[in-house]
């Protein structure tokens, strides 16, 4: 049997959950996950067994699972240990690479019921917003300032300028560009003043719409995944918003931009070399 330690926010949890399910499928070895009321982190983080991930509830157990631990040795992708269908193992780490689960992506999303989740959100939104005609734009501010300032950086305006310029070269000329932007509610004023107004002034053919603050965080992630193209922040949250929007070979031709600086420069041990699929575009600030 296989299990995994769940930790961090929604983006981190999805890496861990997708990895353990893919590992289980590869070796035909069942998995379980310990049910916890919240996710261990430096701040209180929700878990999503009662909403977004409710289809996985049948795999939860109410007691600690004490199996031999495989500790992720590096942030770079490493092949997980070969096991039999009777071995017991606990995965511990972040597993931040699509390479851990990309082969089984479609099967896992079916198990989660992701198509139904998307349809439910579309019905909830009605005609208020049409994300399929919009570019998702993510700003990550608050948790970096409050908690992660030694590990992460706030992405500068120049990155977003360069990302929009890149997308302009890929879409039909004179096509109005609609951007649906995401940030924490407490960062709204800062984002408008320091990003949205300057971007609006620079790109006359763009319009900006704020994703509703009344949506749950997981609903915002699903909404992000419904967008036509994506401009990521240095965040696993928007990484998943883009990844869930694409099929494995990106036949839907989505443009996905991510910043060249993901972590603080002093965090030299946390490599992101295996984080991004090859068809995503790195944009310099």
Q: What function would you assign to each model-found segment?
A:
Residues 12, 39-45, 99-100, 144-147, ...:
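Short catalytic/ligand-binding loop motif for oxyanion handling, primarily in non-cytosolic enzymes
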Residues 6-15:
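A short, glycine/small-residue-rich beta-strand->loop->alpha-helix junction that serves as a flexible
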Residues 16-23:
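Short amphipathic alpha-helix
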Residues 264-285:
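Leloir-type glycosyltransferase catalytic cores
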Residues 1-3:
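Extreme N-terminal starter segment of soluble prokaryotic enzymes
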Residues 10, 175-249, 253-264:
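Donor-binding and catalytic core of enzymes assembling or modifying cell-surface/extracellular glycoconjugates
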Residues 36-177, 276, 285:
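Secretory-pathway luminal glycosyltransferase catalytic domains
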């Amino acid at each position: 049997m296989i299990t995994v330690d769940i930790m961090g926010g929604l983006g981190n949890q999805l890496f861990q959950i997708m990895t353990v399910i893919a590992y289980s499928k590869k070796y035909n070895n069942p998995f379980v996950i310990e049910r916890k009321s919240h996710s261990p982190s430096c701040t209180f983080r929700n878990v999503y067994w009662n909403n977004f991930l409710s289809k996985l509830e049948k795999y939860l157990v109410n007691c600690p699972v004490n199996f031999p631990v495989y500790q992720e040795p590096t942030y770079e992708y490493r092949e997980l240990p070969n096991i039999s269908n009777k071995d017991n193992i606990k995965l511990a780490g972040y597993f931040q690479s699509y390479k851990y689960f990309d082969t089984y992506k479609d099967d896992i999303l079916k198990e989660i019921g992701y198509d139904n989740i998307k349809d439910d959100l579309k019905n909830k939104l009605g005609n208020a917003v049409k994300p399929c005609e919009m570019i998702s734009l993510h700003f990550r501010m608050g948790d970096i300032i409050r908690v992660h300032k030694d590990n992460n950086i706030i992405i500068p305006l120049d990155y977003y300028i360069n990302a929009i310029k890149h997308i302009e070269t890929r879409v039909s000329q004179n096509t109005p560009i609609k951007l649906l932007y995401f940030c924490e509610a407490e960062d709204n004023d800062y984002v408008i003043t320091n990003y949205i107004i300057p971007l609006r002034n620079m790109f006359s053919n763009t319009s900006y719409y704020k994703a509703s603050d009344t949506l749950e965080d997981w609903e915002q992630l699903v909404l992000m995944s419904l967008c036509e193209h994506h401009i990521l922040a240095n965040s696993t949250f928007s990484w998943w918003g883009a990844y869930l929007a694409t099929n494995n070979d990106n036949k839907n031709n989505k443009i996905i931009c991510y910043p060249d600086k993901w972590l603080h420069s002093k965090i030299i041990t946390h490599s992101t070399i295996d984080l991004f699929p090859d068809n995503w575009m790195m944009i310099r600030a």
